[in-house]
Design a protein with these regions (language model features):
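Charged helix-capping and loop-helix junction motifs
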Residues: 46, 65-72, 149-153
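Short, glycine/charged-enriched secondary-structure capping and boundary segments
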Residues: 17-18, 64-67, 100-103, 145-146, ...
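Cysteine-nucleophile active-site neighborhood
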Residues: 53-120
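N-terminal beta1-alpha1 cap of cysteine-dependent amidohydrolase-like domains
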Residues: 1-67, 77-83, 189-217
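Active-site phosphate/pyrophosphate- and oxyanion-stabilizing loops and adjacent acidic/basic residues
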Residues: 18, 22, 93, 135-136
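C-terminal and late-domain segments of enzyme folds
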Residues: 155-217
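Pocket-forming structural segment of enzyme catalytic cores
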Residues: 96-176
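Short glycine-/acidic-enriched loop or helix-start segments at secondary-structure transitions
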Residues: 13-14, 61-62, 95-98, 142, ...
Length: 217
């Protein structure tokens, strides 16, 4: 079973978290924005791993959102206990910052990009054409985190811990073509000559589920 951490501060943008969870198998949800603190891991039987979800907030806004520091502490606990973690978009940034990295605002990007993907099991079946919607970037990775994907202007598009079973991706695996109209309305969208037919990012979630389950055996 996976634990999904909900981090969205804007109720009108929570559809992305809903879309992500619709692609997961058995899972529970913990809403950090509304609950704060930390999940009691002993509440969750057969926990395989944790998915740290996205948010329209930035990790540098922790003074306005005290739950961010609490979640960062929880992430460090997960890393120390070697519980598998997947950080998605804001989660990518939070995990890296929690481990001593640095995140900066770079302006909103919204287009299909071509990524160079490392030979990593997280990317099994994931094509290089990836939808990107984000305004912030990891500019220095956290301690132990190494890049496993990059675009032409973003070196740390995805990262993996050298020792613990921790992966993070800047992209939203749940962002498929059926969400494009909503994303275009809410965030804008730049059309390119890349094709949505080549987008297979949802496989990232299935791969993480498989990796997390294998680790917990």
């Amino acid at each position: 079973m996976l634990l999904s951490l909900e981090n969205e501060v804007d109720p009108d943008a929570r559809y992305l978290g809903d879309a992500l969870r619709s692609l997961l198998g058995e899972h529970a949800t913990y809403d950090y924005v509304r609950e704060g603190g930390r999940p009691a891991l002993d509440r969750f039987d057969d926990l395989d791993g944790v998915v740290v979800g996205g948010s329209t907030a930035g990790v540098y806004e922790a003074d306005d959102h005290p739950w961010m520091a609490e979640e960062a502490a929880f992430v460090r606990e997960l890393v120390d206990r070697e519980i598998p973690v997947l950080g998605v978009c804001f989660g990518h940034q939070l995990v890296n910052e929690a481990l001593g990295g640095r995140v900066e605002h770079h302006g909103l990007a919204h287009r299909l990009v071509t990524a160079d993907l490392a030979d990593d099991p997280l990317f099994d079946g994931v094509n290089r054409t990836i939808p990107a919607v984000h305004g912030d970037r990891v500019v220095d990775p956290g301690d132990g985190m190494a890049p496993i994907a990059a675009t032409d202007d973003y070196r740390y598009f995805a990262t993996r811990h050298r020792d613990a079973p921790v992966w993070t991706v800047q992209y939203h695996p749940e962002f498929q073509h059926d969400l494009l109209a909503r994303i275009r309305e809410d965030f804008g969208w730049t059309d390119t000559d890349r094709s949505w037919a080549d987008v297979t990012t949802a496989r990232t979630l299935r791969n993480f589920e498989r990796l997390a389950a294998a680790h917990s055996r």
